[in-house]
């Protein structure tokens, strides 16, 4: 198999020392991953990448697609790596160029099969724009990994080489094509090829990725030089290029703007009394050195100055350094850091989005889409901010993430978004997956005052009583910390023979039934009424429906909703809908919930398996009594037809 990256061979080997430099620390970049820890000293998470040690194991530096499946899975989970296919990078880079050239498909034309046809002939420039301005446009790929947006020697998701050169789709590839087509002498070509690199930036957390990205840019420059001049560049030029790349592809924690593994930046460390009089001065100095995290430094080539990256976020610098930011940010923290026994991964992509908006006027990113439906775990206030922003819009939405990132399930899909600081777009407001849903929602809202969410229970409406805890204090040890009164999804199993019983006990206490899951199956168990704190709906008819249901596909059938009779409660596995005086009203509500109309309206916000109260915000409330404008005695199909007529809708059979 062809080696895409070989740090031990010419022409990389002579400049490897340059490509390993960290300009912020004036040392080498560090590994910042434990993937290679088994090789011993020098390969640990915080170790610098030493040239001599690296060359003893040079074959470990290879694209992620060439790593073992185990390593890929570990890095995807632990470091939130999702590598972007070339066709996605191409389409996103095309948007960036559409903004500059004021026309679509400048360098190539994407095809339905995700291939692309390169533009033949010389690239035509817009009137009153010089090609040098395009080369000098400063573009940053955040969390760049192997730098697939910047250069495209190969497809990062498949490992396949991209040839010939005019088929390549990276930012630097496009700039070097423009340089090729508009320069005549070697001196002029070198000048502008160097400037193309000067204006192309990327940062990355993990040291192996930083090195691979740098090597990819370095070899990309050589490819274009050889294609134009028929030979490899001279050694002096190669070292100049390697040095520039070491500046422009830097190692950084993108949320803290510091060199990885450092603590938050501290400009001055106040020595403690103990440190001041400690006999172990070396230890005290080591602690001081660790306490002061090193801020990332980048270089402004036109101004010929280095600057702290965090200064770029200040308004005095923000509009001067980057014209455009692009990329695929990490989606979540390491699962092990976010709680819930490693089953929950806290989202962080929204923080990278905000950071990108602070350093460039235009930003294009691909990331999870759940926030568009006010779902997921991103802060609700942040969701609202984005949905109501006049500077933010959606370019493309894909509900099935596996169509973009193979074998990757991202609940709620993924979206390519675009931010323009100077734009005035119509705010998204309510995002719908299909254009037809916008008109349906508009009609329904115009004829509706209340919605089903107003009668859907929130989580935790059933609680264990103080009496249950007093008579059985062992419950506190059995329950999760901070949830001693919860009647959670596993309550029928966890509290069996204490609170819940399969068979009705033969004693003088009053017992009621609870619906829940036992060994994965729906079950009814008996519980003492005085062991439960219950809502008013407990004494009425209601509908029970699973809190988690399906995948989020529009219009999907709900998992067997059922009527809960009076004196029947439920664990947190189920939502409770309504509080009806008689069985007929509950039966009518059940028919409504089963209707296609309801399922489509529910699907506007329910884009994952999560089926919470807020997902019902756009399902209009109905009168379920015999005096209703809907004849509930009809079949569910005929009820659908009545609902379509009521709201002036075409049959939503196609939804």
Predicted segments — roles?
Residues 2-394, 400-404, 413, 420-427:
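SAM-dependent methyltransferase catalytic region
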Residues 75, 82, 87, 96, ...:
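C-terminal substrate-recognition regions of SAM-dependent nucleic acid methyltransferases
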């Amino acid at each position: 198999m062809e080696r895409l990256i070989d740090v031990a061979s010419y022409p990389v080997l002579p400049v490897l020392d340059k490509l390993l430099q960290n300009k912020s620390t004036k040392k080498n970049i560090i590994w910042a991953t434990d993937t290679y820890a088994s090789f011993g000293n020098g390969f640990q998470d915080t170790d610098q990448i030493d040239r001599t040690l690296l060359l003893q194991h040079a074959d470990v530096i290879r694209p992620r697609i060439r790593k073992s499946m185990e390593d890929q899975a570990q890095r995807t989970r632990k470091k939130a790596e999702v590598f972007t296919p070339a066709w996605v990078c191409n389409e996103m880079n095309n948007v960036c160029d559409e903004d500059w050239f004021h026309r679509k498909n400048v360098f190539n034309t994407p095809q339905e099969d995700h291939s692309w046809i390169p533009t033949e002939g010389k690239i035509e420039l817009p009137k009153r724009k010089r090609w040098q301005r395009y080369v000098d446009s400063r573009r940053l790929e955040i969390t760049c990994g192997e730098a697939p947006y910047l250069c495209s020697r190969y497809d990062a998701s498949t490992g396949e080489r991209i040839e010939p050169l005019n088929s390549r789709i990276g930012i630097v590839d496009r700039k070097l094509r423009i340089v090729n087509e508009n320069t005549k002498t070697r001196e002029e070509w070198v000048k502008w090829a160097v400037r193309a690199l000067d204006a192309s930036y990327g940062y990355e957390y993990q040291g192996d990725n930083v090195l691979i990205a740098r090597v990819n840019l370095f070899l990309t420059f050589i490819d274009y030089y050889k294609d134009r001049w028929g030979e490899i560049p001279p050694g002096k030029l190669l070292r100049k290029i390697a040095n520039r790349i070491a500046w422009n592809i830097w190692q950084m924690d993108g949320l803290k703007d510091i060199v990885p593994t450092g603590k938050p930046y501290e400009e001055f460390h106040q020595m403690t009394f103990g440190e001041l009089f400690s006999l172990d001065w070396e230890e005290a100095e080591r602690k001081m050195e660790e306490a002061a995290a090193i801020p990332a430094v980048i270089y402004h080539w036109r101004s010929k100055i280095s600057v702290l990256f965090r200064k770029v976020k200040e308004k005095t610098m923000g509009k001067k350094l980057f014209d455009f930011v692009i990329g695929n940010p990490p989606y979540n923290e390491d699962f092990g850091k976010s709680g819930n026994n490693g089953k929950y991964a806290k989202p962080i992509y929204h923080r990278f989005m905000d950071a990108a908006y602070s350093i460039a006027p235009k930003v294009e990113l691909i990331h999870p889409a759940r926030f568009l439906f006010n779902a997921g775990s991103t802060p609700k206030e942040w969701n609202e901010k984005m949905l109501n922003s006049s500077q933010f819009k959606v370019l493309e939405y894909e509900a099935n993430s596996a169509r973009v990132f193979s074998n990757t399930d991202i609940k709620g899909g993924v979206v390519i978004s675009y931010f323009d600081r100077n734009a005035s777009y119509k705010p998204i407001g309510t995002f719908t997956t299909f254009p037809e849903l916008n008109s349906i929602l508009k009609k329904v809202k115009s004829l509706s005052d209340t919605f089903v969410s107003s009668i859907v229970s929130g989580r935790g409406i059933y609680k264990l009583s103080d009496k249950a805890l007093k008579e059985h204090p062992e419950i506190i040890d059995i329950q999760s910390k901070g949830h001693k009164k919860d009647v959670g999804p596993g309550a029928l199993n966890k509290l069996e023979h204490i609170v819940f019983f399969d068979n009705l006990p033969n004693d003088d206490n009053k017992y009621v039934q609870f619906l829940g899951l036992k060994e994965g199956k729906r079950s009814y168990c008996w519980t003492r009424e005085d062991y439960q704190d219950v809502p008013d709906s407990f004494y009425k008819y209601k509908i029970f429906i699973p809190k988690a249901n399906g995948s989020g596909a529009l219009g999907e059938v709900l998992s067997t909703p059922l009527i809960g009779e009076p004196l029947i409660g439920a664990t947190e596995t189920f939502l409770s809908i309504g509080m009806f005086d008689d069985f007929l009203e509950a039966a009518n509500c059940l028919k409504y919930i089963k209707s296609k109309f309801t399922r489509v309206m529910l699907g506007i916000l329910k884009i994952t398996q999560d089926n919470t109260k807020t997902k019902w915000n756009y399902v209009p409330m109905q009168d379920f009594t015999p005096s209703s404008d809907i004849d509930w005695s009809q079949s569910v199909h005929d009820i659908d037809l009545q609902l379509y007529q009521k709201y002036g809708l075409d049959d939503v059979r196609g939804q």
